[in-house]
Amino acid sequence: MILKHLPWLFIVLAITSAKHGKRSDVNSLLTKVETALKEASGSNEAALEALEGLKGEIQTKPDRVGQATKILGSVGSALGKLNSGDATKIISGCLDIVAGIATTFGGPVGMGIGAVASFVSSILSLFTGSSAKNSVAAVIDRALSKHRDEAIQRHAAGAKRDFAESSAFIQVMKQQSNLTDSDLSIIAANVPVYKFSNFIGQLESRISQGAATTSLSDAKRAVDFILLYCQLVVMRETLLVDLAILYRKGNAEHVASAVENANRVNKELAADTLDFLHKLIPEQALIGAVYHPISASETSKAILNYTKYFGVPDVPRPIGNRRYKFTNSYWNTYSICSEAYMGNYMFRGCSNVRNPNIRVSKMSDGFYTMENSDRRKLYITKHDQGWGWGTLDEDPGDQGHMRFIPLRHGKYMVSSKRWPNWFMYMESSASGYIRSWENNPGPQGHWSIT
């Protein structure tokens, strides 16, 4: 899986075959990475030395050019982030690297023991020092500062300590030139694979609870905890990738493979935890309303990048800029239309709608307007009392800036930017007016958009 966070890697993959790459490309990337390392803050001598070793291997083993090119691409995109001092960027840099390793070698064990593994290990050292400790603490504290949760708070201190101790221990052990069996036993005792699972499991529980909540504040908390969960899973994988390389260095192949397998299983578990986000059922529409539109939220955009890495299927087909027919699921012969009523313009369900008649336009912030295209220009807006009024204003305001929440059965639910938890539905009356209902209105509020 190639993430949009890896712009260099996109370019490299387009010009590199599965086994071989252009020497001019790899030389260009070597120069860029070397320059970035020299300009970066902190001590990067080990990384520069490992880079020289990689240069030598490329010269003597042409078949490694393609793999080296891909890894240099992922490292190049990560370097600025790892040295940024910003926790979110640092974790994004970790994601670049672990994704590059997974894509190129299938995991750290696939790199073998050589210049590429030494180079990657030296780059990971930029993270597995104080950056790991500070990044974990920063993202946990950021999430908990927004949402009070005593149970999560109790486990947070232990999680921060586990990450800090493990990363510091790995960093020290990497300085050993020859690892003995005794050293490997000490590593196993001090960095157990399961050590980070408790807090991550607590977050999984909160995400599960928040998925079906009817509280808007709880739904917002769940989405923030989803981002924290993704960040911690990636940082855990980064530490364990470094640990697997360390075991390979000590010729403990079976242990390195076991660590890598644990990472693989946890990646699958993360995909299972997050899968519902792109396969929502109506009872999960509220968390979907916080998550969508994805382009309107930095949190949602970050989560989407992580879901791609974990292998979660893509979001269902997005709504575009064109006319659509909105057909009700409960009354499946009725679609949205408009009428004039006592000087007001109302939207209702009509049985004679044959062609797409609602123009949907995406706004710059990711939300949409819904405009009747059959008569004079009318925007659907949610009135304070829930009615679906038509307004002649060019900009209907956040009452008429809509979000579309895709459901797993192909239908959509619709709510406004101002009231994300009030969903558009067709009422049970002779007129079939379009109104809004708090939380899931049932099939009367599920729409086929064609």
From Swiss-Prot:
Question: Mind listing the GO molecular function terms for this protein?
Answer: toxin activity
Keywords of the record, alphabetical order, are: Cytolysis, Disulfide bond, Hemolysis, Ion transport, Membrane, Nematocyst, Secreted, Signal, Target cell membrane, Target membrane, Toxin, Transmembrane, Transport
GO terms under cellular component: extracellular region; membrane; nematocyst; other organism cell membrane
User: What residue range is the signal peptide?
Assistant: 1-18
Q: Name one GO biological process term.
A: monoatomic ion transport
Q: Please describe the post-translational modifications of this protein.
A: Contains disulfide bonds.
| Entry's family note | Belongs to the jellyfish toxin family. Type II subfamily.
Function recorded in the entry: Has potent hemolytic activity. Is lethal to mice and crayfish. Causes cutaneous inflammation in humans. May act as a pore-forming toxin, disrupting normal transmembrane ion concentration gradients in susceptible cells.
Misc. remarks from the entry: CrTX-A and CrTX-B are encoded by the same gene. However, they differ by their molecular masses (43 and 46 kDa, respectively). In addition, CrTX-A is primarily localized in nematocysts, whereas CrTX-B is only detected in the tentacle without nematocyst.
Protein's UniProt name: Toxin CrTX-A
Species of provenance: Carybdea rastonii
